[in-house]
């Protein structure tokens, strides 16, 4: 049976325009990026499916802004990266971050894919309103995730903790919330940590 291997080094001058051509218009504004790595799968090039995909790649991007990401197709993966997949009751805590779109100065991460399971331990978004780190795995086949996310607001003293954050039924992708928040010596909240598991829906 044939095997397909691909070495890639892709420079993107406008992330937003590229995603528009790929069926995700108005999901990202501007931004430049570089994507490089190696991917392979058993079969011909046209046999490509996430279930047989293996390899590794690195993504680096600068000066872009996440807008309203579609919840269908590849938009589901984008919504994870931009944190829009977090349930509404959690994003309420970061309305200053998400209200007009999440702008980033730079974004980078290394990823390994094994038969559709994509993992990272160093994904970081340096945003103008917050710094976000993410590690864990996303299953592109079964469309679920097991991620640990830390959000560090740029102006933590202006971010209020919604009372609903710790109350009510847990819906959507969050199965466990770390209730303990990191604090600096002055008692101000400096970071929010979440464990996100479950289906994309």
Over which residues does each language-model region extend?
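Small-residue helix/turn framework positions
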Residues: 1-197
């Amino acid at each position: 049976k044939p095997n397909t291997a691909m070495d890639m080094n892709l420079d993107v001058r406008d992330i937003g325009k590229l995603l528009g051509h790929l069926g995700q218009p108005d999901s990202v504004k501007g931004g430049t990026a570089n994507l490089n790595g190696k991917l392979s799968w058993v079969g011909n090039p046209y046999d490509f499916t996430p279930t047989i995909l293996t390899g590794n790649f690195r993504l680096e991007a600068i000066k872009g802004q996440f807008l309203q990401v579609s919840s269908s197709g590849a938009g589901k993966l984008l919504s994870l990266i931009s944190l829009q997949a977090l349930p509404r009751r959690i994003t309420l805590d970061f309305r200053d971050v998400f209200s007009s779109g999440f702008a980033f100065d730079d974004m980078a991460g290394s990823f390994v894919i094994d038969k559709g399971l994509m993992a990272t331990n160093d994904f970081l978004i340096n945003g103008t309103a917050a710094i976000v780190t993410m590690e864990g795995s996303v299953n592109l086949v079964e469309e679920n995730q097991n991620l640990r996310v830390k959000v560090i607001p740029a102006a933590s003293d202006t971010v209020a903790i919604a009372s609903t954050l710790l109350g009510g039924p847990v819906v959507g992708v969050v199965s466990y919330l770390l209730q303990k928040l990191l604090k600096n010596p002055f008692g101000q909240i400096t970071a929010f940590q979440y464990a996100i598991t479950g289906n994309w829906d």
